[in-house]
């Protein structure tokens, strides 16, 4: 869906955006009809039901490797660091015991989002993660939930900016600065005490809670554009407008085959990948820009967007669910991607459909929240893996890492590694 004329006018007159002017790329229904859940080159290997668990005391899900603004995953003084969304497991809490007094881990897992906290882990090996604890003390974050974002190592002094999402009440992109301290024994993240809210959905480009009570606005991922050197950020949003008011027009349809013109209730799915630009490299002041990619009539969620810059191309990845697809479309939980030669597009859906790495049909919920790193490694967490009959095992732990090859507009699954294998691409020695 293209931007309204008033929105473009505001953009042209904006102090930070300068002469930026572009139309969002449309991920069309015709593109999404090409999604093939049975293509082995875009299917994640099966996860065994006997997987190991990182912790018996906490669930983990969205995983955020410490990195620099160009995407390089870094270690510090030889220690790799990841942040994860974390929630305590409650095996002895009466509210999570069933009628027979047994722990209902499935219900505990389903309730985790309401108590999500940002925690950190460290390792000498890029796996075998040691739990470090909370990043922010209780009460530092101004909302009840701490949702995903990106930790950025700023310099060799150990300063870190954690961009994340403040949720409930509302949803805001926020930043908190702290530092990393290392020793021979381990790692400590310290002084994450002053949270600054950067921006919220504006209602012009991005849907607000007032426009749709089930709106999506989260998952900041800052980066420096390798071409212009400016600091930008992608994030998940929904296209602005009252719920149900969007039109699935010719652009959103794309060249669909006969029999696919009727889209039913697809107007309710209005996901997009948002963009903002910073005033300078400090990242203290930001201005919202129009979406880079819209999925009106295709999908309602484009979570955790992030870039890989390779071979002069911009690879823009996001994750999405089967259940958030619009009526008449389907696709696996997993990674979707778009590729272009410029930050502002236009973009092309990778592998023609957008699908890069999906769960296998026989285990549709085995993994989620993938993060594609510049070395081609892809990390994710285990959600649930089928066991006997209709039963399944809850994960809440790191999944096996896989490697994908990016070749032009195409991608290929190549290798599988150990659970939670997230090696640094570069070691930073603190001064």
UniProtKB/Swiss-Prot annotation:
Q: Extra info from the record?
A: Strain PG4180 contains three levansucrase-encoding genes: lscA, lscB and lscC. Of the three copies, only lscB and lscC have been shown to be expressed while no expression was observed for lscA under the tested growth conditions.
Point out the gene that encodes the protein.
lscB
**Which Pfam family, just one, is annotated for this protein?**
Glyco_hydro_68
Could you tell me the EC number(s) of this protein?
A: 2.4.1.10
Kindly give the InterPro entries that the UniProt entry links to this protein.
Answer: Glyco_hydro_68, Glyco_hydro_beta-prop_sf
Q: What is the name listed in the Swiss-Prot or TrEMBL entry for this protein?
A: Levansucrase LscB
From which domain of life does this come?
A: Bacteria
By sequence similarity, the record places it as follows: Belongs to the glycosyl hydrolase 68 family.
Q: Which reaction does it catalyse?
A: [6)-beta-D-fructofuranosyl-(2->](n) alpha-D-glucopyranoside + sucrose = [6)-beta-D-fructofuranosyl-(2->](n+1) alpha-D-glucopyranoside + D-glucose
The compartments listed are:
Secreted
Which Gene3D superfamilies does the protein's record reference?
A: Glycosyl hydrolase domain, family 43
């Amino acid at each position: 869906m293209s931007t309204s004329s008033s929105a473009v006018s505001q953009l042209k007159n904006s102090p930070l955006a300068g002469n930026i002017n572009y139309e969002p790329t449309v991920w069309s229904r015709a593109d999404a009809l090409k999604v093939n859940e049975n293509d082995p080159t875009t299917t994640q290997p099966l996860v065994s039901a006997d997987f190991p668990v990182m912790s018996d005391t906490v669930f983990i899900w969205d995983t955020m490797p410490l990195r620099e603004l160009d995407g390089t995953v870094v270690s510090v003084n030889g220690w790799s660091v990841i942040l994860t969304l974390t929630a305590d497991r409650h095996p002895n809490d009466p509210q999570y015991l069933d009628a027979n007094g047994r722990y209902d881990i499935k219900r505990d897992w389903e309730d985790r989002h309401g108590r999500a906290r940002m925690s950190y882990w460290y390792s000498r090996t890029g796996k075998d993660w040691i739990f470090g604890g909370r990043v922010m003390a209780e009460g530092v974050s101004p909302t009840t939930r701490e949702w995903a974002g990106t930790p950025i190592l700023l310099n060799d002094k150990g300063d870190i900016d954690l961009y994340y999402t403040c949720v409930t009440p509302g949803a805001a992109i926020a930043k908190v600065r702290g530092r990393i301290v290392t020793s021979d024994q381990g790692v400590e993240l310290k002084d994450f005490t002053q949270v600054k809210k950067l921006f919220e959905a504006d209602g012009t480009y991005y849907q607000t809670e007032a426009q749709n009570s089930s709106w999506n606005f989260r998952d900041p991922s800052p980066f420096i554009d390798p071409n212009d050197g400016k600091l930008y950020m992608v994030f998940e949003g929904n296209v602005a407008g009252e719920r149900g008011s969007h039109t699935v027009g010719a652009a959103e349809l794309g060249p669909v085959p006969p029999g696919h013109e009727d889209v039913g209730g697809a107007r309710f799915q209005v996901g997009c990948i948002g963009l903002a630009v910073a005033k300078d490299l400090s990242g203290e002041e930001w201005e919202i820009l129009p979406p880079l990619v819209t999925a009106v009539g295709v999908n309602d969620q484009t979570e955790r967007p992030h870039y890989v810059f390779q071979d002069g191309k911009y690879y823009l990845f996001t994750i999405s669910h089967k259940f958030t697809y619009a009526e008449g479309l389907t696709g696996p939980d997993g990674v979707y991607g778009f590729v272009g030669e410029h930050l502002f597009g236009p973009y092309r859906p990778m592998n023609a459909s957008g699908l890069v790495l999906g769960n296998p049909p026989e285990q549709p919920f085995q993994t989620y929240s993938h993060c594609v790193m510049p070395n081609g490694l892809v990390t994710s967490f285990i959600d649930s893996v089928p066991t006997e009959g209709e039963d399944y095992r809850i994960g809440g732990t790191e999944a096996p890492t896989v490697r994908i090859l990016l070749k032009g507009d195409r991608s290929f699954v190549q290798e599988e590694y150990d659970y939670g294998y997230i090696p640094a691409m570069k070691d930073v020695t603190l001064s």
